[in-house]
Amino acid sequence: MTKRTESKYKINRRLGVNLWGRPKSPINKREYGPGQHGQRRKKPSDFGVQLMAKQKLRGYYGNISEKQFYKYYEEAVRRRGDTSENLIELLERRLDAVVYRMKFAITPFAARQFVSHGHVLVNGRRVNISSYQVRDGDVVEVREKSKQLAMVLDSVQSAERDVPEYIEVDHRAMKGTFARAPKLADVPYPVQMEPNLVVEFYSR
């Protein structure tokens, strides 16, 4: 088991939820945190509830760094409209998130690595920055040389997840389009996400 995989499962155990809905996650058997005292759970304070909401959202998108996550919050505040909805939109526009939604990778962690290794094209050009912001109408596809990779084929054929309505994808061509910006209600999170609590956490 790699360190990346270990950290992924520790995130699930620490937060007490199966963030990505994976059937083999250890949290399905042990609903408490890692370590000797993992079974001790106290009723969280308001701060604790807000912190948990932030950690869940950060963790879901591949455990984004706190610095980068806070930048998303700042950008969400600057934009017009509901800050919590803006935050979700910014996260869902990440290239690795779009690759994950198109089912070209089995987890957000795998999607980030897939992008950084240069396997993905956006509008015909290779982009290896996982945080790249995909725009409405952008075409995202797997490079020709990468279409037969086992990890891609396994993910596409997996029945674990469905492609959301704001994504259009042709799995035979390994190509898809980011059709529109999603709202929170559109995003198929396996667990409840509360971006409003994230906003409360940062605006304290």
UniProtKB/Swiss-Prot annotation:
Molecular function in Gene Ontology: rRNA binding; structural constituent of ribosome
Any one GO CC term of the record: small ribosomal subunit
User: Any idea which UniProt keywords this protein has?
Assistant: Ribonucleoprotein, Ribosomal protein, RNA-binding, rRNA-binding
GO BP terms: namely: ribosomal small subunit biogenesis; translation
Region named Disordered: 21-45
**Quaternary structure, from the entry:** Part of the 30S ribosomal subunit. Contacts protein S5. The interaction surface between S4 and S5 is involved in control of translational fidelity.
Q: What does this protein do?
A: One of the primary rRNA binding proteins, it binds directly to 16S rRNA where it nucleates assembly of the body of the 30S subunit. With S5 and S12 plays an important role in translational accuracy.
What name does UniProt use for this protein?
Small ribosomal subunit protein uS4
This protein's species is: Acidiphilium cryptum (strain JF-5)
